[in-house]
Amino acid sequence: MRTRVIVNGANGKMGILACETLENHEQFEVVAKLSRQDNLGQSILDTKAQIVVDLTRADCVYENSLTIINHGARPVIGTSGLVETQIDELTKLCEIKQIGGIIAPNFSLGAILMMMLATKASEYFSEVEIIEGHHQQKLDAPSGTALKTAEMIAAARKKPKNKLPLKELTPGARGGSHHDINIHSLRLPGLLARQEVLFGNIGETLSITHNSIDRHCFMPGIVLACQKVLNLTNLVYGLEHLL
């Protein structure tokens, strides 16, 4: 029997491709394709969906996640915009409900490897900044991938970065800061998704860069998340925990 999946945000570019991918996979049945005017909770009940893949917007992803969990389905969240306090609340709710879920800042396996390599490098390089770039339809900044990368680096590095007595002549010139790591966000036509993690040391730099040039690169990660989430009883933040 195929696993019943709802794709929420099915009319977007990622949503259309996710529907096509899951419909062509022998393990899954897409039982509903939802957009913003549809009732997510009622659709879960009507279709008896086991998984909801959320590919919507930053301004509604938290409420969508609560709805999915409270209606007994497993969330696979590919929408950025969740802050740490919201992730903590969703983690607690999944524990109470004993239901699995996945929040994936990035579904690209290459991007996950980039984050893992950057985490390893941070054990040896304490000076690091992140430059992320996306298309202009992505209205939240910085990206979920950049935030997650900063969190992973902060947890792994063995000494704090140098405190520089800099004065910003233009406010924001040094980017935003997350876990004491500067993040610079680009929004340009011609970009899909790009991230560079740039490390510096005396006499050298190390650059770890990943480029997504086609949304198809995210599909293996969506399939992997849908396969793994059925066996979880907790919320997992980051696809790297499933590799």
From Swiss-Prot:
GO terms for molecular function: 4-hydroxy-tetrahydrodipicolinate reductase; NAD binding; NADP binding; oxidoreductase activity, acting on CH or CH2 groups, NAD or NADP as acceptor. It catalyses: (S)-2,3,4,5-tetrahydrodipicolinate + NAD(+) + H2O = (2S,4S)-4-hydroxy-2,3,4,5-tetrahydrodipicolinate + NADH + H(+); (S)-2,3,4,5-tetrahydrodipicolinate + NADP(+) + H2O = (2S,4S)-4-hydroxy-2,3,4,5-tetrahydrodipicolinate + NADPH + H(+). It comes from the Bacteria. SUPFAM superfamilies: Glyceraldehyde-3-phosphate dehydrogenase-like, C-terminal domain, NAD(P)-binding Rossmann-fold domains. Pathway: Amino-acid biosynthesis; L-lysine biosynthesis via DAP pathway; (S)-tetrahydrodipicolinate from L-aspartate: step 4/4. The keyword NAD applies. NAD(+) binds at G9, A10, N11, G12, K13, M14, G78, T79, S80, A104, P105, N106, F107. The active site is at H134 (proton donor/acceptor), K138 (proton donor). Keywords: Amino-acid biosynthesis, Cytoplasm, Diaminopimelate biosynthesis, Lysine biosynthesis, NAD, NADP, Oxidoreductase. InterPro entries: DapB_C, DapB_N, DapB_N_CS, DHDPR_bac, NAD(P)-bd_dom_sf. This is 4-hydroxy-tetrahydrodipicolinate reductase. The keyword Metal-binding does not apply. Belongs to the DapB family. GO terms for biological process: diaminopimelate biosynthetic process; lysine biosynthetic process via diaminopimelate. One of its GO terms (cellular component) is cytosol. Gene3D superfamilies: Dihydrodipicolinate Reductase, domain 2, NAD(P)-binding Rossmann-like Domain. Catalyzes the conversion of 4-hydroxy-tetrahydrodipicolinate (HTPA) to tetrahydrodipicolinate. HAMAP family: DapB. It is found in: Cytoplasm. (S)-2,3,4,5-tetrahydrodipicolinate binds at H135, G144, T145. Its EC number is 1.17.1.8.
